[in-house]
Structures are given as structure tokens and as C-alpha cells.
């Protein structure tokens, strides 16, 4: 039902009037019956046109609750469980996204801000709101890059409202400021995957002499995430984050052309080769293109276990 989702975490819930005051486009308020579906599915909301020719809508709703990081259960919290299952918090979002975002965030001030939030504003895209039951979820000539850019610009505007704390992209498990996002978008035509995704560096507890680098969030752009595992003293380690970011941007810009067997190299000429992995080493659950250094003879079997704890 929804193809993108970015949120703004707030110290207190803003009003729809607060939202309208910072928006440059005309927005219509949701009918009362729609807002009464329950805060999990739709809070008090505004709707803006995105692509009118295919019924594209940008929906912005106010949730006067903390971000629900747990999925709930079909027995005790059926509405929350259904909302997660239907992608109401993002099409590629998994439970625990905010917890993992805080765990991996280097800027601890952003984490402190996120921990203060009591409400959030959710920005989503849909092509089936108010449409007939046979409407397609994805229209012809669907462009996830243009779509995510539109949602990002709205998030930047909403981050200027009094009480806004930090942006949270649950699909990318990423915290960032509106200014950081604006700076990245202003670099166009360079694709800002460095803010649309998380590029993580993890030293596993069982094998502290190894490092795991990966991306989270490329599913927003309809391409695979990337992963690179290597010894901590390997020459590519200092280039790994930039290398993954570069390959992710290339893959997204060209519509997902990278595949197993493809090769790349870091700035010092050390080669890596792609393999397909149906399960990433680190959560959230997803398939990844796993890049392997050409001079690496073997990766320990322990690194094949999902969700390794950090050292």
C-alpha cells in the first residue's frame, strides 16, 4: 500500500496547522473517518499530490505515540501487527529498526535526541489511496529515486517545526538531521545514498579480528543491500565503507545492474568479487550482495550466523 516512509521524531506532537505552516504545496486534511482508523494505520493527516496522473499521494500523519519498534502480536495487538505486515512503517522496515539505528549511530547526540521523542510525524507515498480495489500498488514508469527525494524534501521542511528532534528513516535504520539530509540532496546529480541508507561497521564479538561492513536501506530504491566481510588488518578495511557506498549508488542509479560475479576495487586497486547471499550476517533480515576480497582465502564459518553480537 505504501512505497516509502520517513519519519520525524518530535518532543511533543505537532498540530496539522503546524505542518501546513511549513509546507509549500497545498495539502488537504483527511476525512474524520479515515483518521479514526487508529493511530497505527493513520493518524490525523494531510495529503498532497505526488503524481496526479497515476493517483500518487504523499500522506503526512501525526502520531501522538512513540515510534512502535516492536511488531506486536496477532492476538494482543492485531492492528499493530497488521500495520507492520502491510508496510505502514515502510515497505522494507523490520521490527527493531529504531533500536538498531541507535545502536549503530556514531553521533550519540542524535541517539539522545531520538530517546527523548514522544511522538512522530510519518511521511508516506501511496498510489492506491482513494483508488478502486483493482488499482496497482506500483504505477507504470515507477521511479523510486524521484519518490524518495520528494519524501526527503518534505522531511526537511517538517524538521523545522518547533519540537522536532531528529529524522528517522526506518527503512534505512538511520537517524540524521534535516540539515544533513539537505546538504546531501543539494549535491545532485550525485545520488545521496550516504543519507538514504546506513553504512555500518561492526566488529563481531566472537571474532574481534574481523570486521563486517554493510548497507541498510537500498530496498527503498528497489535494489539489493551490500555486505563486505574482511580481517581487521586487511588493506581494504579503511576503504570499505566508501567502497560499499559507491557500489550502492552505482547500482541504484543504473537500476540494479550488479550481480554475482561482478568485480570492483578500492582506491588502492585491491579487488573484490560479488556473491549472492540470501541472508545478511547482520539484521534486519534481507538478501545482500556479499563482496569478497580477491586475496581472501577463507571466511570463518561463524560469520555465516545472522545477528552476531558486537565486540
Regions found by a protein language model. Name each.
Residues 1-54, 66-68, 287-311:
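Short, extreme N-terminal segment that most often corresponds to the first beta-strand
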Residues 17, 149-152, 238-242:
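Short, well-ordered alpha-helical segments
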Residues 76-196:
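Internal, hydrophobic cores of structured domains that mediate oligomerization or house catalytic pockets
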Residues 8-14, 125-127, 232:
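Short beta-strand-to-loop capping motifs
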Residues 170-310:
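Aromatic/basic-lined ligand-recognition segments
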Residues 7, 139-147, 232-236:
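Conserved aromatic-histidine-acidic binding/catalytic patches
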Residues 29-32, 36-114:
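N-terminal low-complexity, intrinsically disordered segments
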Residues 28-37, 149-167, 249-258:
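Structural alpha-beta junctions
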Amino acid at each position: 500500500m505504501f512505497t516509502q516512509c520517513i519519519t520525524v521524531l518530535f518532543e511533543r506532537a505537532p498540530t496539522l496547522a503546524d505542518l501546513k505552516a511549513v509546507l509549500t504545496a497545498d495539502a488537504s486534511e483527511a476525512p474524520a473517518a479515515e483518521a479514526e482508523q487508529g493511530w497505527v494505520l493513520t493518524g490525523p493527516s494531510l495529503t498532497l499530490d505526488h503524481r496526479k496522473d497515476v493517483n500518487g499521494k504523499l500522506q503526512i500523519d501525526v502520531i501522538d505515540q512513540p515510534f512502535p519498534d516492536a511488531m506486536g502480536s496477532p492476538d494482543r495487538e492485531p492492528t499493530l501487527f497488521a500495520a507492520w505486515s502491510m508496510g505502514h512503517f515502510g515497505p522494507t522496515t523490520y521490527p527493531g529498526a529504531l533500536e538498531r539505528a541507535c545502536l549503530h549511530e556514531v553521533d550519540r547526540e542524535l541517539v539522545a535526541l531520538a530517546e527523548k521523542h514522544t511522538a512522530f510525524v510519518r511521511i508516506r507515498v501511496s498510489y492506491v489511496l482513494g483508488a478502486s480495489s483493482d488499482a496497482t500498488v506500483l504505477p507504470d514508469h515507477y521511479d523510486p529515486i524521484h519518490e524518495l527525494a520528494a519524501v526527503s524534501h518534505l522531511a526537511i521542511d517538517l524538521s523545522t517545526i518547533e519540537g522536532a528532534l531528529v529524522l528517522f528513516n526506518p527503512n534505512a535504520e538511520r537517524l540524521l538531521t534535516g540539515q544533513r539530509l539537505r546538504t546531501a540532496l543539494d549535491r545532485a546529480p550525485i545520488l545521496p545514498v550516504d543519507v538514504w541508507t546506513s553504512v555500518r561497521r561492526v566488529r563481531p564479538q566472537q571474532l574481534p579480528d574481523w570486521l563486517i561492513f554493510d548497507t541498510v536501506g537500498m530496498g527503498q530504491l528497489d535494489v539489493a543491500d551490500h555486505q563486505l566481510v574482511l580481517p581487521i588488518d586487511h588493506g581494504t578495511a579503511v576503504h570499505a565503507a566508501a567502497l560499499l557506498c559507491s557500489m550502492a549508488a552505482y547500482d541504484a542509479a543504473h537500476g540494479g545492474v550488479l550481480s554475482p560475479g561482478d568485480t570492483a576495487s578500492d582506491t588502492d586497486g585491491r579487488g573484490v568479487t560479488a556473491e549472492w547471499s540470501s541472508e545478511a550476517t547482520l539484521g534486519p533480515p534481507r538478501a545482500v550482495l556479499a563482496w569478497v576480497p580477491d586475496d581472501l582465502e577463507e571466511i570463518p564459518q561463524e560469520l555465516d550466523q545472522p545477528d552476531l553480537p558486537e565486540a
